[in-house]
A protein has these predicted regions:
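Ser/Thr/Gly/Pro-rich low-complexity, disordered linker/stalk segments of secreted
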Residues: 1-25
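Generic low-polarity alpha-helical segments
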Residues: 3, 12, 64, 68, ...
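Generic ordered-secondary-structure signal
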Residues: 8, 12, 20, 41-46, ...
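Residue-identity detector for glutamine
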Residues: 8, 15-16, 63, 79, ...
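Compositionally biased, intrinsically disordered low-complexity regions enriched in proline and serine
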Residues: 9, 16-17, 30-31, 56, ...
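Short, well-ordered surface patches within globular domains
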Residues: 24-102, 157-159
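A well-ordered secondary-structure block
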Residues: 91-191
């Protein structure tokens, strides 16, 4: 009976691996566990178009979603007339510095493919808006205007997103201060 007890978990593990093995081997750090619902929705929408063109589907990755959530940085812009603007944003430097915290390799590469924004005042509001976004080709262009997820950047395999409050604020030279909440969703690809 002891032997059967020891062998049973091994057989289950082997069977489970056989049933879930992807067409190509995944890196050891890859896991769908922890991927957020919105990343899954985006990947489903985008993959319909990618697969229709014969391109490999994007995958969701819990580690990427966790990394994006950890990588907010407060940005500051000082205007020539002395006005100081601040806001939150996900930055490439923060992504790179947090890689080991989520178990991703140090040579991971990233590209931001879109912001989803619509003057949303809460997490739920931007979540519902983002779920309904029409993913036209125009939405997914990088800083140089190149199409990314549909016809280029095909070496990027993973998609992730994060929703956060930009926490915009402005301090004028006369001391007047204003702040506002605007929730946005950033969509990134990783390879």
């Amino acid at each position: 009976e002891e032997n059967n007890g020891e062998n049973q978990p091994d057989e289950n593990n082997v069977q489970q691996e056989d049933n879930t093995a992807p067409a190509e081997p995944e890196p050891s750090y890859y896991s769908e566990d922890g991927a957020n619902e919105l990343s899954r929705i985006f990947a489903d929408k985008i993959n319909k178009k990618r697969e229709g063109r014969g391109y490999a589907p994007l995958r969701v990755c819990g580690q990427l979603d966790s990394l994006l959530a950890l990588s907010l940085e407060t940005m500051t812009n000082v205007q020539s007339e002395g006005e100081i603007d601040t806001w939150n944003e996900i930055t490439l430097d923060k992504l790179k510095s947090n890689l080991s915290d989520v178990g991703l390799p140090s040579d991971s590469e990233f590209i931001r493919v879109s912001y989803v924004m619509n003057c949303c005042k809460s997490y739920d509001e931007v979540f519902e808006y983002a779920k309904k976004v029409n993913f036209s080709n125009e939405l997914f262009t990088d800083d140089e205007g190149d199409l990314t997820v549909y016809s280029q950047r095909l070496d990027y395999k993973y998609l992730g997103c994060a929703i956060y409050d930009m926490c915009r604020s402005q301090l004028k030279p006369n001391g007047d201060y204003s702040s506002s909440s605007e929730y946005v969703c950033e969509i990134w690809l990783m390879k």
